[in-house]
Amino acid sequence: MFGKGGMGNLMKQAQQMQDKMAKVQEEIARMEVTGEAGAGLVKVTMTGSHSVRKVDIDPSLLEDDKEMLEDLIAAACNDAARRVEENQKDKMAEVTGGMQLPPGMKMPF
């Protein structure tokens, strides 16, 4: 089934991929992205592990409707989370060489 050294090479490749994935996971956890809403009036900075680091609200919004401000904050958080997911997907694609995973399966396993 496997040629000479085939199984050993396969195991070596798997270990290398696992090492690369560990490095990428560390990089993802350290990265920060900023989501925006209201044309940049509300900005949310989030880490790769989805922790909100900072919320920046333009002072002009503090005079407006509380409900609108709450909606903008939620939208900015959702935008930041979407950006984190996109970055994670891109970083993992670098490691897997674009290998497609079955729907619903996330890396790491």
Curated annotation (Swiss-Prot):
GO MF, one annotated term: DNA binding
Gene Ontology terms: cellular component: bacterial nucleoid; cytosol
Localisation: Cytoplasm, Nucleoid
UniProt KW keywords: Cytoplasm, DNA-binding
Residue runs in coiled coils: none
InterPro entries: YbaB-like_sf (IPR036894), YbaB/EbfC (IPR004401)
Subunit structure: Homodimer.
UniProt protein name: Nucleoid-associated protein Swoo_1794
Source organism of this protein record: Shewanella woodyi (strain ATCC 51908 / MS32)
Lineage: Bacteria, Pseudomonadati, Pseudomonadota, Gammaproteobacteria, Alteromonadales
